[in-house]
Amino acid sequence: LAKEFIPPIEREDIVELSQHIDTVTDKVEDVLLRIYMGNAQEIEPDALEMTDVVIQCCEKVRELLTAFADFRRSKNLKDLIIQINALEETSDKLFMQSMRKLHTECTDPLHIIVWREIYIYLERCADACEHVADTVESVVMKNS
């Protein structure tokens, strides 16, 4: 019997997955920093809608990682990955709509600059969640 613990997946995959998880938290922090640095006094309704999608993405990532702990027997990994990808697509659409609205309806250049950055980083949060899901999918494929 081996006396050392051998993880069910490669170390490189664990490192890659943990880096993508860390990126999610970094991107969320980046949104908050943009709000603070831009001195945004009120939150735009479009930002609230995008934030709701980011929260849903993060919740699905949490569910995915919980299911991933026993990925060989998990029945809902594929569904969670699909849901995260769909949420990221929703985020892309909201991003485009928000940016269009910002650039066509707003006349204050400072407001445009601040909210452009915030929208970009909200969208990057959803992208980061999708990267976690893609990495989980890749690891499952390699180890099934």
Predicted regions located by residue number:
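Cytosolic, long alpha-helical scaffolding segments
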Residues: 1-144
